[in-house]
Swiss-Prot record:
The active site is at residue 164. This is Stilbene synthase 3. One of its GO terms (cellular component) is cytoplasm. Homodimer. Mediates resistance to pathogens which are sensitive to stilbenes. It comes from Vitis vinifera. One of its GO terms (biological process) is defense response.
Length: 392
């Protein structure tokens, strides 16, 4: 008879969790930041608010965003005008849209990741799904499992309303699942659609206006597993360690409240300072065991909460400008997609490394860090180890 210890050892993988494939997807509808103020004030019937529109246009200009992809169209707003009002009861119709579209967009990213991975979907043992939108039972994880035709025995984890730090949360969760279940292959999906947060402008809610200028829709999927079979799987990044912390006395710094009017967004002006003053402590705790204290020796995947946050972190840590290039590129091309952002940046990082003929998937560097920042104020820190590039 096997002992409990023997059973536990047999259940565990030998090596670290590894990202084996990445897929991303966006809605078709694209909005350009240069004329978004005109579009936004027109579709919300707010063109009479001329001074506020000028202020919003300045916010858009400073956002460092070129374009975003958004599921919500002008035709949908014409059909459901309460969504475009500032504070009108609209949760029911928002839910009707989101509970269908969030899993559908997640499916698009998941299929791309599965195709890159190249293995039968029957080998997916676990599913981790994350979204800030559309709470229901059974959840988006159940819907996605059915849309993809996964095994009925797939072990599911559903994460709702985590917010912008959750790209780190899903990787931390997938790491624990992969390393504690030998042979596990974890499909991780983040799918975000801003139908739940879209609303018209108000003079009394400038933080809401900031959100309207920043957020975009997108989904990203990764497949995570330990002990990859390199004859049929292509490792991209190892997940070496993962930690979460929250900054004391900052519960309201980034917040969302689900109400009859949808999900309202609240933001303190000092969020960039709060994050930049606490990020080095997270780095030190994560990299001390590795003897690393030069933050410019790392490749960087940082959630792009907005340009002010990136600028503050860059200045506080004396980072070279090129360190946040991949992060700024994703912000520019897609906006802030909440939990999906860091997975988009991982994808950009490995593609950029391949195109630039770098030695590793981390722009030629061995070690990297992935940061998620969000409500709480919560910081997720994931230590990454890159993989030598395959040239064929």
């Amino acid at each position: 008879m096997a002992s409990v210890e023997e059973i536990r050892n047999a259940q565990r993988a030998k090596g670290p969790a590894t990202i084996l494939a990445i897929g991303t997807a966006t809605p078709d509808h694209c909005v350009y930041q240069s004329d978004y103020a005109d579009y936004y004030f027109r579709v919300t019937k707010s063109e009479h608010m001329t001074e506020l529109k000028k202020k919003f246009n300045r916010i858009c200009d400073k956002s460092m965003i070129k374009k975003r992809y958004i599921h919500l169209t002008e035709e949908m707003l014409e059909e459901h005008p309460n969504i475009g009002a500032y504070m009108a009861p609209s949760l029911n119709i928002r839910q009707e849209i989101i509970t269908v579209e969030v899993p559908k967009l997640g499916k698009e990213a998941a299929l791309k990741a599965l195709k890159e991975w190249g293995q039968p979907k029957s080998k997916i043992t676990h599913l981790v799904f994350c979204t800030t939108s559309g709470v229901e039972m059974p959840g988006a994880d159940y819907k996605l499992a059915n849309l993809l035709g996964l095994e009925t025995s797939v072990r599911r984890v559903m994460l709702y309303h985590q917010g912008c730090y959750a790209g780190g949360t899903v990787l931390r969760t997938a790491k624990d699942l992969a390393e504690n279940n030998a042979g596990a292959r974890v499909l991780v999906v983040c799918s975000e659609i801003t139908v739940v947060t879209f609303r018209g402008p108000s003079e009394d809610a400038l933080d809401s206006l900031v959100g309207q200028a920043l957020f975009g829709d997108g989904s990203a999927a990764v497949i995570v597993g330990s002990d990859p079979d390199v004859s049929i799987e292509r490792p991209l990044f190892q997940l070496v360690s993962a930690a979460q912390t929250f900054i004391p006395n900052s519960a309201g710094a980034i917040a969302g409240n689900l109400r009859e009017v949808g999900l309202t967004f609240h933001l303190w002006p000092n969020v960039p300072t709060l994050i930049s003053e606490n990020v080095e402590k997270c780095l030190t705790q994560a990299f001390d065991p590795l003897g690393i204290s030069d933050w410019n020796s790392l490749f960087w995947i940082a959630h792009p909460g907005g340009p002010a946050i990136l600028d503050a972190v860059e200045a506080k840590l004396n980072l070279d400008k090129k360190k946040l290039e991949a992060t700024r590129h994703v912000l520019s091309e897609y906006g802030n997609m909440s939990s999906a952002c860091v997975l988009f940046i991982l994808d950009e990082m490995r593609k950029k490394s391949h195109k630039g003929e770098k030695a590793t998937t981390g722009e030629g560097l061995d070690w990297g860090v992935l940061f998620g920042f969000g409500p709480g104020l919560t910081i997720e820190t994931v230590v990454l180890h890159s993989i030598p590039m395959v040239t064929n």
